């Protein structure tokens, strides 16, 4: 992974978790060939372990195949919630939790 190719390493993306794609706004250009072009996504894999889906892939420079970053995305269901995480030098770090129920219990107000 190459910190010289990105504007900011592991930027905080809040709750924006990307299962695929690239965060091109954070890409300053390839440190090896000095070109700023689209990226290739290679070595994509999907694993399921203990009810958790893990998607990993590499971001590569389209021109010289320099490895810019390794992307990891996870999805799991915990109790009544879907949980997502993303960790990538280029795309950033993020996590999100969404209720699988029609009405999110976290948004309910208690009535006394």
From Swiss-Prot:
Function of the protein: Transcriptional activator that mediates FGF signaling during neural development. Plays a role in the regulation of cell movement.
Binding of Zn(2+) 3, residues: 59, 71, 88, 91
Disulfide bonds: none
PANTHER family (alphabetical): PROTEIN CHURCHILL
Domain of life: Eukaryota
Protein name: Protein Churchill
Residues that bind Zn(2+) 1: 2, 5, 30, 66
Molecular-function GO term, any one: zinc ion binding
Keywords for the protein's UniProt record, in alphabetical order: Activator, Developmental protein, Metal-binding, Transcription, Transcription regulation, Zinc
Family named by the database record: Belongs to the Churchill family.
Binding site residues for Zn(2+) 2: 30, 33, 61, 64
Species for this entry: Homo sapiens (Human)
GO biological process, one term: fibroblast growth factor receptor signaling pathway
């Amino acid at each position: 992974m190459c910190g010289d190719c990105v504007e900011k390493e592991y930027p905080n993306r809040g709750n924006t978790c990307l299962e695929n794609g690239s965060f091109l706004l954070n890409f300053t250009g390839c440190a090896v060939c000095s070109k700023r072009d689209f990226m290739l996504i290679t070595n994509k894999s999907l694993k399921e372990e203990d009810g958790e889906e893990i998607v990993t892939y590499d971001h590569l420079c389209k021109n010289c195949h320099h490895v810019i970053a390794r992307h990891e995305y996870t999805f799991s269901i915990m109790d009544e919630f879907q949980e997502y995480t993303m960790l990538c030098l280029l795309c950033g770090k993020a996590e999100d939790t969404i209720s699988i129920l029609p009405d999110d219990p976290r948004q309910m107000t208690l009535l006394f």
